[in-house]
Design a protein with these regions (language model features):
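Short, compositionally biased leader-like segments
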Residues: 1-10, 71
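Short, basic/aromatic recognition patches
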Residues: 7-22
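Small-residue (primarily alanine) positions within well-ordered alpha-helices
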Residues: 13, 31-32, 61, 65
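Short solvent-exposed loop/turn micro-motifs enriched in small/polar/acidic residues
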Residues: 24-26, 87
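Short beta-strand scaffold segments in enzyme catalytic cores
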Residues: 26-35
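Zn2+-dependent cytidine deaminase-like catalytic core
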Residues: 42-129
Length: 132
């Protein structure tokens, strides 16, 4: 039996997307991260005139969760206008907490697809590589 309802996570991500601050790209992203505890942490992208300082929705959700004590995650839903996937930096940050994370990639029309972090970031770098 599945531990979560994909539609609940996708809806939370859609709602988070509405809070995005994207005056430069107009590319609004929302994320909803499900912790092992059952809590959902949301995030949106926050752009900056100095582009490298922009914070992605996925990383916002992770930082919120970790700052509240959550360290284990089940799934994340990411919603964009066109169903774009998480960027490389977000994939790597999510990888820090495990590679079996379910990733739901949705768009504003309600379509989504399901994948895993292992599929999006094969042969990834992890804490085990640092300890060698």
């Amino acid at each position: 039996m599945r531990e979560f309802d994909p539609q609940v996570l996708l809806e939370k991500a859609r709602q988070a997307r509405e809070q995005a601050y994207a005056p430069y790209s107009n590319y609004r992203v929302g994320a909803a991260l499900l912790g092992r505890s059952g809590r959902i942490y949301t995030g949106c992208n926050v752009e900056n005139a100095v582009y490298p300082l922009t914070t992605c929705a996925e990383r916002t959700a992770v930082v919120k969760a970790v700052s509240e004590g959550e360290r284990e995650f089940v799934a994340i839903a990411v919603v964009t206008e066109n169903g774009g996937t998480p960027c490389g930096a977000c994939r790597q940050m999510l990888r820090e907490f495990g590679e079996d994370l379910v990733i739901l990639i949705g768009d504003t029309e309600g379509r989504y697809r399901e994948t895993t972090l292992r599929q999006l970031l094969p042969d990834s770098f992890s804490a085990a590589d640092v300890r060698r």
